[in-house]
Amino acid sequence: MDRKTYLCGRDKNEAVSTPHEYTIEQILAAEIHALQNIPHENDYEGAIGLILERVHEGGGRLITSGMGKAGQIAHNIATTFSSTGTPAYFLHPSEAQHGDLGMVCSSDVMLLISNSGKTREVLELVALTRRMYPTLPFILITGNPDSPLSGEVNVCLSTGNPKEVCPLGLTPTTSTTVMTVLGDLLVVSEMQRIGFTYHDYSLRHHGGYLGDKSRELQTEQR
């Protein structure tokens, strides 16, 4: 079938030219390659320890933030942290400028996600937060460890800046895959640090398959 006829708003006779085309095997290989090349030298322990100190020892919360696709990853990371024993929420950088910054407390820690490391709204969020709480710490996940944002944070976790597996080289694809995995790394490591159990899990999952499964596993463990 001629793919030209399937794009909304385009004349079906309009010529199509994409800079590059990937096979399914190449797409999968590119995603795997990106994961295999996540920098091992990142200060993972620093990030994990900072969350432990601020949230579990200091009574604060983990705040995640980002714009666009990175923001969606940040939102997912926040909900996963919350469901596994680390109180967290997502703060939209733009909404923060219209009152939502009031949700931030001095004991919190903020996890920012920006592939470029120079997202305007995220840079503004850092500046505005520091006006309220000058010592509040920041963690950054980015593809650009030499960026303006990198110079503003306490811990910087590099994605390795993988090439996007997109015909145009623009759409966040491999970069968001790595961001998600780095979020998983932080979540799982924090669960292990705090000794999160089946019982703890069941208290936070009252319904659905996972709730039933956690209670079943808790019973088996007794």
Provide a role label for each language-model segment:
Residues 20, 33, 56, 75, ...:
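Histidine (H) residue identity feature
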Residues 4-5, 9-57:
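An N-terminal, well-structured beta->alpha segment
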Residues 39-42, 92, 194-198:
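General structural signal for secondary-structure boundaries
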